[in-house]
Amino acid sequence: APTGSGKTLAAFLAAIDTLVCEGIEHGLTDETHVVYVSPLKALSNDIQKNLELPIAGIRAELERLGLPDVDIRTMVRTGDTPQADRASMRRRPPHIVVTTPESLYILLTSASGRKMLATTRTVIVDEIHAIAPNKRGAHLALSLERLQALAGRELVRIGLSATQKPIGEIAKFLTGADAQCTIVDTGHIRERDLAIELP
């Protein structure tokens, strides 16, 4: 889908819906459910901020309907994350962790990181076209397999890109060559206004 079309929020919707339903039903536990991986630290910070508004809107609607409050917590974990925030994540894991491929690897190598990530259900890899074809992609593919082994369940894996072709190859990268997956391609084609002028 094209840039600015809401791919990232759409990717989060099912996971957020599950968290809200669980929260209403019996309250949310302090467990990480979603890991969002971005190739850029700046994008990670933007995503966390961009999630705050929809989550606040959901909480306001729950209050209006007289339903229990569901406080979905998000935190960024990159190389720039202050030690105080890292300690906070260890004490009380966020429901959504926003990170980079390198920081995901580091989390998977520490006991506290593995404990936090063991409850993961969904992984969202944004701007996958920027990661897949290089060493970072190979590194991330290994981290995704390690995360799935740690979680002990099939993870929902979502890859997002505005430009990736062929999509099938990226699907294999994200899920493994033999895994079943669904590819959603909006088929967006930009209109072109071309003219040929001969002198």
Language model segments and positions:
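Conserved P-loop/Walker A NTP-binding site and adjacent catalytic elements of P-loop NTPases
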Residues: 1-199
